[in-house]
């Protein structure tokens, strides 16, 4: 189980770091800025979660592995060949961002549920879902603010709602189905909802619609 959790978290870290770094490249940041944006996207949600739950210092400071993986991923995204591959085609860029963001989003949502479950005795479903959603959206929220964009969770494709559904699924399935199954199903649900909402342009009601 520990190996699964480590690999699962690293996959989410790579996905979120890649989405942050590529956005930094698109915004014309230098290599330091790209790394900071990738690192913040990958670790920001977990830091906010840990502070909320009283787990200080946050896990990212206790074990630098995730931070190192995020920085290495960001440097790879900054390579000339990768930049030209993604920046030269808008559809390719959009698809890459959707897949990376959705994967990281789903993984960190259920990781947040797991951490909350292990930190609090007999946690309520509300707490599990709240912490899961906060962990999932936190990194992307910080990424968008630092990049000077309107946070994606407020304007596009039922972003936070996907995290909400995945967190509920993970929290409900944990006891009857087991931790691993609950996390996989919850993360898959978030990923699927995000991709489907982007493809079919599902959005919440908007005043300018």
Which residues make up each language-model segment?
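Helix-coil boundary and interhelical linker segments in multi-pass alpha-helical membrane proteins
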Residues: 1-4, 51-61, 113-127, 172-182
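Small-residue-rich segments of transmembrane alpha-helices in multi-pass membrane proteins
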Residues: 38-46, 96-112, 132-134, 158-171
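C-terminal ends of transmembrane helices
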Residues: 17-27, 50, 76-93, 141-151, ...
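Short, structured motif recognition centered on aromatic/hydrophobic residues
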Residues: 36-40, 47-53, 130, 134, ...
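Ordered, amphipathic secondary-structure segments that act as subunit-interaction surfaces
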Residues: 70-114
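Structural signature of hydrophobic alpha-helical transmembrane segments
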Residues: 1-13, 59-72, 123-136
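Loop-to-transmembrane alpha-helix initiation sites
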Residues: 62-68, 124, 155-163, 177-187
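The first (N-terminal) embedded transmembrane alpha-helix
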Residues: 6-19, 34-40
């Amino acid at each position: 189980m520990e190996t699964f959790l480590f690999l699962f978290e690293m996959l989410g870290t790579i996905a979120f770091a890649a989405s942050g770094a590529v956005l930094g490249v698109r915004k014309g940041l230098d290599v330091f800025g790209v790394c900071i944006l990738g690192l913040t996207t990958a670790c920001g949600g977990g830091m906010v979660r840990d502070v909320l739950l009283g787990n200080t210092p946050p896990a990212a400071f206790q074990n630098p592995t995730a931070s190192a993986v995020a920085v290495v991923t960001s440097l790879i995204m900054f390579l000339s060949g990768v930049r030209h591959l993604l920046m030269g085609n808008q559809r390719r860029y959009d698809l890459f961002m959707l897949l990376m963001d959705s994967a990281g989003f789903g993984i960190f949502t259920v990781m947040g549920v797991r951490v909350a479950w292990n930190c609090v005795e007999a946690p309520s479903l509300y707490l599990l879902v709240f912490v899961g959603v906060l962990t999932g959206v936190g990194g992307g929220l910080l990424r968008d603010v630092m990049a000077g964009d309107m946070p994606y969770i407020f304007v596009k494709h039922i972003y936070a709602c996907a995290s909400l559904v995945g967190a509920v699924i993970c929290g409900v399935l944990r006891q009857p189905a087991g931790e691993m199954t609950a996390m996989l199903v919850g993360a898959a649900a978030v990923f699927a909802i995000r991709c489907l909402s982007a493809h079919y342009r599902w959005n919440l009601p908007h005043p300018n619609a």
